[in-house]
Amino acid sequence: MVSFTKTFFAIVACALGVQAHGYVDTLNVGGTQYTGYLPYNDPYTTPAPQRIERPIPGNGPVTALTTIDVQCNGENGGGSSPAPLVATIAAGGKIAFHWTTWPSSHVGPVITYLGKVPSSTDVTKYSPTGSDVIWFKIDEGGYSNGKWAATDVLSAQNSTWTVTIPSSLAPGQYIVRHEIIALHQAQTYPGAQSYPDCFQIRVTGSGNKTPSGSYLVSFPGAYTATTPGIAFNVYTNFTSYPIPGPAVWTGN
C-alpha cells in the first residue's frame, strides 16, 4: 500500500509539472567558461549572441521521446539547429554543466552522450538525422543510496554536473548531449520528461579510439516506450533504477 506521504508527493509533483523546469545556462569546457544558449534572451538580442550550444525553445521538456526533438531539444519544433561556435578540449579534460534552478520534485537521472561528427563535415553545419547512429554515453547518474542524481546530487554540487572526456577518445568534432530525464510523471508512457542540451566541441590529443557496436545509438531511437527506466513509478517502494540508454563507454 502506497503511503500517504508518497501519495501527497505525487499530487504535488503533478501540480508542479507545468511550472519551472531548467536548462544549462553556463558551462566550463576544459577550463574555459561559456554561456549557454539563453532561450529567453538570445532570440531577442541583436546581433544574436554567438554560442557553442544549439538553440532550445525554453525550459520545458520533450515528452515525445521518439521524435527528433529528443536529440537536442527543438528550437521551433522539428529539431534544433547548429550553433556558430565550437569549444576546444583535450581528451581527458572535464566539462562542468551548470543548471538553472531545478525543481526538487523532478527526480531522475543525469546522462551525457557524445555524437561523433563525420570527418568531412563541419559541426557548425551538421544536423544528425534520426537514423544517424553516432551517439555514445560517457557519463550517467541515477538513483543510489536513496538519492537521485537530478535533484539530490545536482543540488549538493551547486547545480553543477561534471563529466570527463575519455582520455583515449580520437580527436575530432563532437556534439555533447547533456540531459536530465524527469520521472515525476513517468508512471506510464508518455510521461517521462527529457531536458536535452547540446554543445559543440573539438577534441584534441593523441587518442585513437571510438566506440562501436552496442555502445552506439541514434536520437530518436535510443528511447522507446518499453526502454527500461522510461516508464518508472517513483512513488512505489524501489531500491534501484535502470538508467535508460546504452552502457557507458569509458574509452577502453
UniProtKB/Swiss-Prot annotation:
Residues involved in O2 binding: 184, 193
Record's keyword annotation contains Disulfide bond: yes
Cofactors demanded by this protein: Cu(2+)
Annotated InterPro entries: AA9, AA9_LPMO
Superkingdom of the organism of origin: Eukaryota
Swiss-Prot/TrEMBL catalytic activity: [(1->4)-beta-D-glucosyl]n+m + reduced acceptor + O2 = 4-dehydro-beta-D-glucosyl-[(1->4)-beta-D-glucosyl]n-1 + [(1->4)-beta-D-glucosyl]m + acceptor + H2O
Biotechnology: Lignocellulose is the most abundant polymeric composite on Earth and is a recalcitrant but promising renewable substrate for industrial biotechnology applications. Together with cellobiose dehydrogenases (CDHs) an enzymatic system capable of oxidative cellulose cleavage is formed, which increases the efficiency of cellulases and put LPMOs at focus of biofuel research.
Keyword annotations: Carbohydrate metabolism, Cellulose degradation, Copper, Disulfide bond, Glycoprotein, Metal-binding, Monooxygenase, Oxidoreductase, Polysaccharide degradation, Secreted, Signal
Glycosylation sites: 158, 237
Gene Ontology terms, MF aspect: metal ion binding; monooxygenase activity
Function: Lytic polysaccharide monooxygenase (LPMO) that depolymerizes crystalline and amorphous polysaccharides via the oxidation of scissile alpha- or beta-(1-4)-glycosidic bonds, yielding C1 or C4 oxidation products. Catalysis by LPMOs requires the reduction of the active-site copper from Cu(II) to Cu(I) by a reducing agent and H(2)O(2) or O(2) as a cosubstrate. The synergistic activity of LPMO9B with xylanase Xyl10G or cellulase Cel5B shows efficient bioconversion rates of 56 and 174 percent in pretreated kenaf (Hibiscus cannabinus) and oak, respectively.
Protein name (Swiss-Prot/TrEMBL): AA9 family lytic polysaccharide monooxygenase B
Species, as recorded: Gloeophyllum trabeum (strain ATCC 11539 / FP-39264 / Madison 617) (Brown rot fungus)
